[in-house]
Amino acid sequence: MEREELKRRIEEAIDQEAEALMAYADDIRKHPELGFEEYRTSDKIAEYMKSLGLSVTRNLAITGVKGELVSSDKGPHIAVMGELDAIICNGAPYADPQTGAAHQCGHNVQQTVLLAIAAGLIRSGAYKELDGRISFLGVPAEEYCYLEKRLQLKEEGKLHFMSGKAELIHE
């Protein structure tokens, strides 16, 4: 299949998924969670990945999620990442009143873009035209804040690194 036709099919599939994707982004924005505490977010992204037919692995680097799409054993293995955590930003619109967590860095949008890419490739069938494997990674605790929690997890032997991204790669 020609490249332009693949692109057209992917764009069409994403357009058809737009309402669900926008609802996902809005839901995550309204329920921000701090690093290594993204339990609800992790549940939501895993649920969406499963609805697309991805093989999902949970609890990576504590709250991380991986969805895998394999088109063939040959070819590259690439990753698409979307960060799960929020930052502390008291007073921001949709900040959690108890934790002050808010998606001021747009991680809810990153997650949605990750899901849009997956949906576009899967729903269009375009992934069947490609070689290789794609891992869609929901990355925990990317923002380097809330250090007390990270130090505690490290002391408990639950982390090797203070960064969720480094921890996810380590696993």
What are these regions (language model features)?
Residues 3-104, 108-135, 140-143:
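Acidic/His- and Gly-rich active-site-bordering loop/insert found
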Residues 139-171:
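Fold-level recognition of mixed alpha/beta catalytic cores in primary-metabolism enzymes, strongest
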